[in-house]
Amino acid sequence: MVDESNAGPVAPAVVADAEVKAPTGKKRSSSRPQKAPPEPAQPKMPAAKRRGYSEQERSEKLRLIETKVSEGNTLKDAIKSAGISEQTYYHWKGAAKSAAREDIERTRPLSAGDEFAELVQLEEENQRLRKQLAEKLRTENTELRKRLGLD
């Protein structure tokens, strides 16, 4: 069975006064599918609250760790048994060391030259304070005289 409608040669179609438009600009692609709305965030577990230790608690834990290490435990095990992290241990140890160094510097005896310089400084401060007190007493005295009508 032959289809007779397609059997002959095809004549070109001529369209008069038709303008051929050249493509201009970018071709638009088909619209993209919309993004799915973000899933609601799962409620996060609250982070563990930081525990603040007092100076006394810190020094007790450091002493506890030192005694456990001297008994033969490893440093890591001693720190774990104290309930703090290694980082916290080293931070506390450094702070305690610097505080001890400051105490030593404060209690160090002064040399003769330092003692003399400190004495001169104290005498200057004493003179300044005496002048300040005298001026304050003078102004207070004049105000009292005015109130009493003695001036």
Curated annotation (Swiss-Prot):
Residue ranges, compositional bias (Basic and acidic residues): 52-65
InterPro entries (alphabetical): Homeodomain-like_sf, Transposase_8
Protein keywords: Nodulation, Plasmid, Repressor, Transcription, Transcription regulation
Keyword Transcription: yes
MF terms in GO: DNA binding; transposase activity
Protein biosynthesis listed as a keyword: no
Chain segments carrying region Disordered: 1-65
Composition bias type Low complexity, residue spans: 7-23
A biological process from GO: DNA transposition
Family to which this protein belongs: Belongs to the SyrB family.
Descriptive protein name: Probable transcriptional regulator syrB3
Gene: syrB3
